[in-house]
Amino acid sequence: MPHTAEQWNERYRGAPCDLPREPAEILAECLPLLPAGPALDLACGAGRNTLFLAGRPQSVTAADYSAAALEILESRARAAGHPVERSSVLAPPHGPRGAIRIAEVDLERARLPENSFELILCFQYLQRSLFRGMEKALRPGGFLLFETYTRAQVDPDRVGVTHRKDFPSGPHNPNYLLAAGELRTAFPTLETLFYRELRAGKGIATLLARRPDL
């Protein structure tokens, strides 16, 4: 899996036509529960989840380190008629619902604005230093939907899988993989609404959590 911005750029420039357009399955399933206020899509990639929310319509700030991925997102967003603005600030976009703010940022060093978003998405990305900031960036009553890979990806025997090929996606470095049960307790100030950890056939953990009202 790529690590540097240039490696990610090469990946996105190499196969833009093959990139998925459908949202993450869990996002589509949870949509009726999720607030429609300003959203933040961390490590958005080419923006399949950003565009899904913007079509709701919902204002979305889409953040990623790859300029190439964000170029694809901007092209798709403009083609769909969404207002687009570029910024290095991780704040809600200006403009009507359906507007998208595209932010090219290094998430390893990013600071999230407090009490700014009603919904935060984080898919297939793990940066533990962001966890406290993600909690604080939610407005009271705001939701976090988080899904990424676990260490079952590199320890398949523990879950009854005999070949690494059964886990074709995700990083190999354990530092970028969740330990068993880690995501369940990663956001102690939030109320867990749903948690799932798949170990047979997939090494993925999913969390839907909510910041309590004041």
What is the meaning of each model-derived region?
Residues 126-135:
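A short, conserved alpha-helix within the catalytic core of class I
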Residues 1-34, 36-45:
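Conserved class I S-adenosyl-L-methionine
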Residues 142-149:
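Conserved beta-strand signature within the Rossmann-like core of class I S-adenosyl-L-methionine
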